[in-house]
């Protein structure tokens, strides 16, 4: 009962943010977000999406292998594409990750470790975004927000995101807390693990920022990249909050606030976030092909299990 109530609450909060933006800024920002996208932006999204997906899948491979699980890069890329697509079209924005975690764990004969590999991989990505957000926003005070407020916002976002991930019951299994801690040390903190994982996470973040820049230019923003990057980092950080509808909600709200605070206009921030959301969905579309082509294989696997 509590799980069901929390699931509905998350969706309602995300929907509430979008409704509030709709009432405050009108429909034009949403309409413009669809109208300004051209073939050039679509191809850019597909290219950037390929790069970020490969980088993220590679990160997953590193974590999984450190935990003793087999995972080839080609298979990881296909599974990651499918997860991104499901995350984009299904509520909550994490159901695709749940599927790839459970499927990989079952195939490797260790469901708990398969799930932990995905959780740790996602934590690594979020950690880099949080660190980048703190570093960039403190280094570039031209955003217009007081430094104390920035720290409070980032701190709250970080605490909520980490608490949400840590509280997830599917991160646990019957092996107990000691095995989970051991996997964290091996998968993320080991000397031969964290440098590569950090580098891949930083490169993937750069790709997401590049897609945001494409979105900003599509809506006609003439602001320099140095001014846009802090706004984009904070918007990306908001996507980690577990109160969204397929990634929509907090990202658009934060983008409207920070673009407005920077003097670029809340409407431009909202339109940029909408364009980014559409382009991110376009970038995940290869995952739909993976889902269709691999469906018969998955059905046979489920019968075998």
Placement of each model-derived feature along the sequence:
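Predominantly cytoplasmic-facing regulatory/coupling regions of multi-pass membrane proteins
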Residues: 1-81, 138-240, 266-305
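Membrane-interface alpha-helices at helix entry/exit sites of multi-pass transporters
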Residues: 74-78, 92, 96-97, 107-123, ...
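Transmembrane alpha-helix interface/packing and boundary motifs in multi-pass membrane proteins
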Residues: 84-92, 233-248, 252
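Mid-bilayer segments of alpha-helical transmembrane spans in multi-pass integral membrane proteins
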Residues: 84-94, 122-134
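Re-entrant/interfacial helical elements at transmembrane boundaries that shape
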Residues: 96-106, 245-260, 274
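Hydrophobic alpha-helical membrane segments of integral membrane proteins
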Residues: 99-103, 115-119, 128-130, 243-245
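Transmembrane alpha-helix termini and helix-breaking/packing motifs in multi-pass membrane transporters
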Residues: 131-142, 261
